[in-house]
């Protein structure tokens, strides 16, 4: 077994697979701004294993190499779908499972009909990423934060990579300390004029793609042309692109997106965060969308369930009090416990956050049940690759244990996967995805836990973790760029509910009634055993 250095310089053991992660990044130092300057209460919640220092892409060679292999996409679904990212570790050559539920980066980038690809992400490992492309691709536009793009090492460069690298256009985004260009978005254009959009939960590095569980939202094929009616998804996507205020994005990306007919996505909403001071985004924008769509839908005889599955939990909203973004701000806003944001005499939006005990009473009276899915220490122990995927999960609660104990012991908000329902190959491996969802059940009789979160009022799949950095608050703008897709029952035809299933056991819906959302964790989830379960925390293992 090898040993690795933790953030504070102490040593701990790591597995052989974790050693491979370290070898991949061993020549890259951590960003001094992000790691050394972050104060205790900074809400820096990067959910990624490392943040690399600024680098430049190396010069191209003139060598070329033809690829005879022709790769075809196998996704023929007419509507938007969720897929599980296939893993080189969990699904090996002998895998015979539900391949229709899975996708690879080769499926996304490797088709010979792909003409242009536009990528937004937080981390890029170029020698891994560019090998996923077919040689026929004409242009690859990469939008990334300075210091997060891993160049191709000289010893890894070959003729195939050199050919692809010549087609790359890099747009670098300068971000302030403790902020991230965290959006994960792919826009593909094909040689027949069609377009397709993907929202993966992973950044473009080998280990992040393969070690934690990852998912990908895939749009249907979109044609070039005009819509008969305005499409909110398109409008919000263009607003997001405009928020960069960069000529290269306007010329190379926005103009192309404007030519696409987004009518097939008319039932969905694009939800985003941007640090731009000129646009409303993040929590306030999401709240406004829900308010507009949810008007008149509340019922007094229902129990209301609100679930957040995340790979990172930010620090308390307040230094003086223990306040969590989900339990103390988002759910109270969504349910009307908290009054809508109002401006004071100085024009600033304000919100009065109730004390914890008052909120717990309100939740009880209004039949509101909050859930946060976050991996336990034991889930890593029982997962196939043990601690190897743990580097992508962050909740540094030892710095303020009262905050953690409030969530765990007072709200009893933490839930985990049901170990009896996980798959043999992936086991209790946690998911790096971020889902926010709401459903209602009849409160007159006993609640059937197996049916909770099968039919939803709404579901947001996003890159945004549970933090102020990603979402902002009522009075603060987000610091990150984030992107996601919102399903809402009021947008669906025939007043349907948003249907949800799990990849672990449920099969795809029949052709006439497909499921809208698929999640990489078990449904139902089960509550933490307060006598045994603790949230995973890296600091617990500093001296292992």
Curated annotation (Swiss-Prot):
GO terms for cellular component: mitochondrion; nucleus. It is found in: Nucleus. Pfam families: Tyr-DNA_phospho. Its main location: nucleus. The keyword Nucleotidyltransferase does not apply. Residues 312-316 are annotated as: Interaction with DNA. It comes from the Eukaryota. SUPFAM superfamilies: Phospholipase D/nuclease. Its EC number is 3.1.4.-. The record marks 467 as: Interaction with DNA. PANTHER family: TYROSYL-DNA PHOSPHODIESTERASE 1. Belongs to the tyrosyl-DNA phosphodiesterase family. DNA repair enzyme that can remove a variety of covalent adducts from DNA through hydrolysis of a 3'-phosphodiester bond, giving rise to DNA with a free 3' phosphate. Catalyzes the hydrolysis of dead-end complexes between DNA and the topoisomerase I active site tyrosine residue. Hydrolyzes 3'-phosphoglycolates on protruding 3' ends on DNA double-strand breaks due to DNA damage by radiation and free radicals. Also cleaves 5' phosphotyrosyl adducts resulting from dead-end complexes between DNA and the active site tyrosine of topoisomerase II. Contributes to DNA repair after radiation damage. This is Tyrosyl-DNA phosphodiesterase 1. The gene is TDP1.
């Amino acid at each position: 077994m090898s040993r690795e250095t933790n953030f504070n310089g102490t040593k701990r053991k790591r597995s052989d697979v974790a050693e491979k992660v370290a070898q991949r990044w061993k020549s890259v130092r951590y960003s001094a701004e992000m790691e050394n300057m972050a104060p205790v209460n900074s809400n820096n919640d990067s959910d990624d294993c490392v943040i690399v220092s600024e680098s430049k892409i190396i010069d191209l060679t003139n060598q070329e190499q033809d690829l005879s292999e022709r790769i075809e996409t196998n996704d023929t679904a007419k509507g938007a779908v969720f897929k599980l990212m296939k893993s080189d570790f969990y699904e090996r050559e002998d895998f015979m499972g539900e391949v229709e539920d899975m996708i690879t980066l080769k499926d996304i980038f490797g088709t010979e009909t792909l003409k242009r690809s536009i990528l937004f992400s937080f981390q890029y490992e170029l020698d891994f990423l560019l090998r996923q492309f077919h040689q026929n691709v004409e242009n690859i536009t990469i939008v990334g934060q300075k210091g997060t793009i891993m160049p191709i090492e000289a010893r890894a460069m070959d003729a195939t990579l050199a050919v692809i690298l010549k087609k790359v256009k890099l747009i670098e985004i300068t971000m302030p300390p403790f902020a991230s260009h965290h959006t994960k978005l792919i826009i593909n254009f094909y040689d027949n004029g069609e377009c397709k959009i993907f929202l993966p939960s992973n950044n473009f590095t080998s280990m992040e793609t393969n070690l934690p569980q990852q998912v990908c939202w895939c749009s249907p094929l979109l044609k070039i042309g005009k819509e008969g009616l305005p499409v909110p998804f398109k409008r919000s996507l263009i607003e997001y692109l405009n928020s960069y205020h960069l000529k290269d994005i306007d010329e190379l990306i926005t103009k192309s997106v404007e030519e696409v007919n987004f009518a097939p996505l008319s039932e969905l909403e694009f939800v985003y965060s941007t640090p731009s001071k000129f646009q409303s985004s993040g929590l306030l924008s999401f709240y406004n969308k829900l308010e507009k769509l949810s008007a008149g839908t509340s019922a007094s005889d229902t129990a209301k369930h609100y679930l957040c599955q995340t790979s990172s939990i930010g620090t308390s909203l307040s230094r003086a009090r223990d306040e969590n973004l989900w339990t103390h701000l988002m759910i109270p806003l969504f349910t009307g416990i908290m009054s809508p944001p109002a401006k004071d005499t100085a024009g600033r939006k304000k919100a009065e956050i109730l004390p914890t005990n008052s909120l717990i009473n309100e939740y009880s009276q209004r039949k509101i049940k909050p859930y946060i899915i976050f991996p336990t220490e034991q889930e890593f122990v029982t997962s196939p690759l043990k601690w190897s995927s743990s580097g992508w999960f962050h909740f540094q609660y030892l710095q303020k244990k009262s905050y953690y104990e409030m969530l765990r012991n007072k709200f009893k908000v933490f839930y985990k996967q049901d170990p009896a329902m996980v798959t043999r190959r992936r086991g209790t491996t946690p998911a790096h995805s971020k889902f926010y969802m709401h459903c209602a059940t009849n409160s007159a009789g006993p609640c059937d836990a197996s049916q909770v979160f099968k039919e939803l009022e709404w579901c947001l799949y996003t890159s945004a973790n549970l933090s102020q950095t990603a979402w902002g608050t009522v009075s603060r703008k987000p610091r990150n760029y984030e992107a996601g897709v919102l399903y809402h029952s009021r947008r669906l035809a025939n007043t349907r509910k948003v249907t949800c299933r799990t990849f672990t056991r449920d099969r795809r819906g029949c052709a006439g009634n497909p499921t809208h959302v698929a999640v990489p964790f078990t449904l139902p989830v089960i509550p933490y055993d307060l006598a045994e379960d603790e949230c995973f925390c890296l600091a617990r293992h500093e001296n292992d």
